[in-house]
């Protein structure tokens, strides 16, 4: 009798394990199509913000439409599901993107009218963010992830998609984002010389009483100067270039000049190829928005088309078409567990699809890769860089 019980127990255990394992190696659970120009490896940790798409627009024009629509944050609760709350407050146009936060069970949720909502625990043990909290100094609803890995996103935020990224704080405590300028504007001083600074962290180039141009040390980008024959010169990669003065009284920057800008016979100033290459490198980053990272923010990494959260769980589209994090391995019956990318427009995509759907579930929205009912509306999941504020 004992022997029979042992066999039955072993059989049940084997059945349970077999039921959990995906039907094939999970890393091969990927769509057949890929997004043109999509990035499958992203160097840094990022979050997502929900961007509603007009229901009257087609998928091909969705990116343009989304830029003028509301920005909504997604949250993740403990079971890995991605969800969003309703009735979030409006966001300043200078706001950084809304961060997605993650709680214990892996579900992603966002509260209403706050970016730092109080977190509560419901009867089944899942942790969820509350609605209508009024936390101070908020500009957008934060997305959170609870323990089960589900991802949730907020509704009714009113900020356009930002193209600026760096975050600063003004006197009244509000957080503002500046643009990702690749080079400073070129200016001309009184004696006709042309100057330009790029991403300097030290003092700008100044002009003293006799009209000479001087530059301070510890600049991260070299100032442009003009020597006696009218040519414009600029140094590159100077981190602490000392300033020297030549016999004609003009000031020039010293060493580590790779290629000087030159002036051709018609008076036009030409930049070096190194400068244009630097600008091109900056423009290849598809993510053009940032958000402050807080406790519980959904943090994701993308490598080789596989999406993971801060706990190492696998981002997948499960059997009911919901986007959530589980495992590894991903949840049994998962449809896709690989094939993720960030599109050239900065949106998260699975295969060749960057349109997801937020579907109302109580006070939150769950996220799906397909339209599954009348309570669903199309959205983009905008990738956002996360920074410590």
Curated annotation (Swiss-Prot):
Gene Ontology biological-process annotations: fungal-type cell wall organization
Site (Cleavage): 72-73
GO molecular function terms noted in the UniProt entry: structural constituent of cell wall
InterPro entries for the chain: PIR1-like_C, Yeast_CWMannoprotein_PIR, Yeast_PIR_rpt
Subcellular locations according to the entry: Secreted, Cell wall
PROSITE patterns: PIR_REPEAT_1, PIR_REPEAT_2
PIR1/2/3 repeats: 71-89, 97-115, 116-134, 140-158, 164-182, 183-201, 202-220, 221-239, 240-257, 258-276
Site (Covalent attachment to cell wall glycan): 81, 107, 126, 150, 174, 193, 212, 231, 250, 268
GO cellular component term, pick one: extracellular region
Domain notes: The PIR1/2/3 repeats are required for the covalent linkage to the cell wall. Their number varies among different strains of S.cerevisiae.
Family in the record: Belongs to the PIR protein family.
Protein name: Cell wall mannoprotein HSP150
Organism of this sequence: Saccharomyces cerevisiae (strain YJM789)
Top-level taxonomy: Eukaryota, Fungi, Dikarya, Ascomycota, Saccharomycotina
Gene: HSP150
């Amino acid at each position: 009798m004992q022997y029979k019980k042992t066999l039955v127990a072993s059989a049940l255990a084997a059945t349970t394990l077999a039921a959990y394992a995906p039907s094939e190696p999970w890393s091969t659970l990927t769509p057949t199509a890929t997004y043109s120009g999509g990035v499958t490896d992203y160097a840094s940790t990022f979050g997502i913000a929900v961007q509603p798409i007009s229901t009257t627009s087609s998928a091909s024009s969705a990116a343009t439409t989304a830029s003028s629509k509301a920005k909504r944050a997604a949250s993740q609760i403990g079971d890995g599901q991605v969800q969003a709350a309703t009735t979030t407050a409006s966001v300043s146009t200078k706001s950084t993107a809304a961060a997605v936060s993650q709680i214990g069970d892996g579900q992603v949720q966002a509260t209403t009218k706050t970016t730092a909502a109080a977190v509560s625990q419901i009867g089944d043990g899942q942790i969820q963010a509350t609605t209508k909290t009024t936390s101070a100094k908020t500009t957008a609803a934060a997305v959170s992830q609870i323990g089960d890995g589900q991802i949730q996103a907020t509704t009714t935020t009113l900020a356009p998609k930002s193209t600026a990224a760096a975050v600063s704080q003004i006197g009244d405590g509000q957080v503002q984002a500046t643009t990702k300028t690749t080079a400073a504007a070129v200016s001309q001083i009184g004696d006709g010389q042309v100057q330009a600074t790029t991403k300097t962290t030290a003092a700008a180039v100044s002009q003293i009483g006799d009209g000479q141009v001087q530059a301070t040390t510890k600049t991260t980008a070299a100032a442009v100067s003009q020597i006696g024959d009218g040519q414009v010169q600029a140094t590159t990669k100077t981190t602490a270039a000392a300033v020297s003065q030549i016999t004609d009284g003009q000031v020039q920057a010293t060493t580590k000049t790779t290629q000087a800008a030159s002036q051709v016979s018609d008076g036009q100033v030409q930049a070096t190829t190194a400068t244009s290459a630097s600008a091109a490198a900056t423009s290849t980053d598809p993510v053009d928005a940032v958000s402050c990272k807080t406790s519980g923010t959904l943090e994701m990494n993308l490598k080789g088309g596989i999406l993971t959260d801060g706990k190492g769980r696998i981002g997948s589209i499960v059997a009911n078409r919901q986007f959530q994090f589980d495992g590894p391995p991903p949840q049994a019956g998962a449809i896709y567990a690989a094939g993720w990318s960030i599109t050239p427009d900065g949106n998260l995509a699975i295969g060749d699809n960057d349109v997801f759907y937020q579907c109302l579930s109580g006070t939150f929205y769950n996220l799906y890769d397909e339209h599954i009912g009348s309570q669903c509306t199309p959205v983009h999941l905008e990738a956002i860089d996360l920074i410590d504020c």
